[in-house]
Amino acid sequence: MIKTAKLPLELDTEFIQAVTDLFENKITFNQVLGMKLTEVKPDHVRARLPMRTDLIGHYAHQRIHGGVISACLDAMGGIAMMGAMGARHFDESCEQRMKRFMKLGTIDLRIDYLRPGVDTHFDLSAEVLRLGSRVGSARMEFRGSDGKLLATGTGAYIVS
């Protein structure tokens, strides 16, 4: 979690709506995946992914594809960075803060698969570990509906 007194505890509604719209509607690949944000805070985000047959990677066991897990965790790390960047630049307009997304990109991503993903839906979370002036880092989790940890990720993101 980011340790700084400069960040507000909450984000403004306009920014949260803009980030949600970006994540769920404007990033086409996220539409394909089907993730829906459930919480956007300055230091973390949460989302839900309903299981669908087109996300299956192992047909015999009905497991979610590892690439889906990886893509979802990467997207969560990126949107967590957006929340932190939005909080850091709280004095800017929503439009100015959203333009910062254009500079955001994944530098490094590591995924650890811990258990097979067989469920009706999955819960995802990401927390910002550090937000520097050029690079940020995040830790992400992919859990089953029962709360069991199925995969973890860490990511580094260019933020400027």
Could you say what each language-model-derived stretch is?
Residues 1-160:
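Terminal targeting signals and extreme-terminal segments of soluble enzymes
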